[in-house]
Amino acid sequence: HIADLVTKLQASPQYANMLIVITYDEFGGVWDHVVPPKGDKLGPGTRIPAIIISPLAKSGYVDHTPYDTASILRFITRRWSLPTLAGLTTRDNALKANGQPAMGDLSNALQ
């Protein structure tokens, strides 16, 4: 179970610098009442829940920044100063062209 995995990760000496993201890549149907932002032909799609577990996460905070599953890649790219992936640039440019903000990189949920 996920809870067992999280408990083991939290017991790790590396946990002080760890970010655990629990999410999934399927929304499960048409339940969401919020219309997805208009981007390119592939998305972003409907909202999906995510939980961030980390000593670096803001405690008791609900982040309303728009994210997609590629936001995890955005975070890794930003954190380690890697070149931006072309697909992320394409998606963000499509969102901006439609008057929407680019997707976030999870940093708003962190201290």
Regions found by a protein language model. Name each.
Residues H1-Q111:
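N-terminal pro-sequences and low-complexity stem/linker regions of secreted or lumenal proteins
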